[in-house]
């Protein structure tokens, strides 16, 4: 199901997306809806981040670690058998994968965790907290804390801990304390709420490495900027591979960090169609989904105004997805803005469609994608028949599926 797109965005609207207003807003979305206790910490974070980006010692260290520790640049891989699968008599698109699954820790999340850890050190913060759903951001945060000798506490919903037991052990092995959250739905929303409570209590000694382009300003901008290396590399790699920008960008969207990292470098290039794929769960016509943009309304969650899943009284509703990383009733404010001005299109696919796509990609390409990433692959069934032959598609392969094997096996009727 797609959202209705308004007329083509104006140059000014696109420029507004590059950097939010002084009040941290993308259009009407964003802002800082937080306790007064956190305002100095947010101001310090914005100031230190701005200074860091102008400091060559910071950018050089970040670039060096992205290369030698994370393993960047990640390759742009031509998925020939997947492309062949969608070929018709007239031809078909060519499908490329931006291989963020090949990063150290197995997903895009470490780009942001590494950058924020370096910022925390600059601010003199020795204790790090983070929230996690699928566990990938938790693992990435625990990894960089081990690298720099920082205390690490990860908040994770009890349901997600059961779904992602392997990642829970990885975090503990890396020296992190994993704090179970049993409140509410015991998933990502509740883990985020608990992390924010911790931060309010320990703001002087603690830095919160928020894992998505959500939350109060400057986090949506900060997380996006650390992930923008994805799109920067993709733009250059596309020129080398086929001499121009891609026609279509595809990425899954929960909070939206991997999608924003891919989209950011292409926002002002209107020849590039950008599609974010949300989780439709059991179907958007049911109450068990996480299709925030395609089904949500404007509200405030975790410090920012954005599109949310909420009832008529403004109470945030439970989200559902087979993917723990997409199981979130909100979305980053910049995604809400890009949807509102018509620069990006947002669609949704079901659990079943994502599982089918995961199996298809595994068998055709020898790559087992994360369940989150599988949602982006699933949209190819709808997208490809409408495309002209020779269309160049780039899918952000945001993470590998090792963490999801137990979940997938159970759904397919296998005992492990």
Swiss-Prot record:
Annotated keywords: Amino-acid biosynthesis, Aromatic amino acid biosynthesis, Lyase, Pyridoxal phosphate, Tryptophan biosynthesis
Pfam family, one: PALP
Any one GO molecular function term: tryptophan synthase activity
Pathway where this protein functions: Amino-acid biosynthesis; L-tryptophan biosynthesis; L-tryptophan from chorismate: step 5/5
Signal peptide coordinates: none
Chain segments carrying region Disordered: 1-23
Cofactor entry: pyridoxal 5'-phosphate
Enzymatic reactions: (1S,2R)-1-C-(indol-3-yl)glycerol 3-phosphate + L-serine = D-glyceraldehyde 3-phosphate + L-tryptophan + H2O
UniProt family annotation: Belongs to the TrpB family.
Full protein name: Tryptophan synthase beta chain
């Amino acid at each position: 199901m797609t959202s209705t797109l308004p007329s083509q965005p104006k140059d000014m609207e696109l420029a507004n997306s590059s950097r939010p207003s002084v009040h941290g807003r993308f259009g009407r979305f964003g802002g800082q809806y937080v306790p007064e206790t956190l305002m100095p910490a947010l101001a310090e974070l914005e100031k230190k981040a701005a200074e860091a980006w102008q400091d060559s010692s910071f950018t050089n260290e970040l670039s060096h670690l992205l290369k030698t520790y994370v393993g960047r640049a990640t390759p742009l891989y031509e998925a020939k058998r997947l492309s062949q699968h969608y070929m018709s008599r007239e031809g078909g698109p060519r499908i490329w994968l931006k291989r963020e699954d090949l990063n150290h820790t197995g997903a895009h999340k470490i780009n942001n965790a590494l950058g924020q850890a370096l910022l925390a050190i600059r601010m003199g913060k020795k204790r790090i907290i983070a929230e996690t759903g699928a566990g990938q951001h938790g693992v990435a945060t625990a990894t960089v804390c081990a690298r720099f000798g920082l205390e690490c506490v990860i908040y994770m919903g009890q349901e997600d801990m059961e779904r992602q037991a392997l990642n829970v052990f990885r975090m503990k092995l890396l020296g992190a304390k994993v704090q179970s959250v049993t409140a509410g739905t015991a998933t990502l929303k509740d883990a985020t709420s608990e992390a924010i409570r911790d931060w309010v209590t320990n703001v002087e000694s603690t830095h919160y490495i928020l894992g998505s382009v959500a939350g109060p300003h400057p986090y949506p901008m900060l997380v996006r900027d650390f992930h923008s290396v994805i799109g920067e590399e993709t733009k250059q790699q596309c020129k080398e591979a086929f001499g121009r920008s891609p026609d279509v960008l595809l990425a899954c969207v929960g909070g939206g960090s991997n999608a924003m990292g891919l989209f950011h470098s292409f926002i002002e290039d209107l020849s590039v169609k950008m599609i974010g794929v949300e989780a439709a769960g059991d179907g958007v016509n049911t109450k068990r989904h996480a299709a925030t943009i395609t089904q949500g309304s404007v509200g405030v969650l975790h410090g920012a105004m954005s599109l949310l899943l909420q009832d008529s009284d403004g109470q945030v509703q439970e989200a559902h997805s087979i993917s723990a990383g997409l199981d979130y009733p909100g979305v980053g404010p910049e995604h809400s803005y890009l949807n509102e001005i018509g620069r990006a299109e947002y669609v949704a696919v079901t659990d079943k469609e994502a599982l089918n796509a995961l199996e298809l990609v595994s068998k055709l390409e020898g790559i087992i994608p994360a369940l989150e990433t599988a949602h982006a692959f699933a949209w190819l069934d709808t997208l490809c028949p409408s495309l002209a032959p020779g269309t160049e598609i780039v899918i952000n392969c945001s993470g590998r599926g090792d963490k999801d094997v137990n979940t997938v096996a159970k759904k397919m009727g296998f005992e492990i």
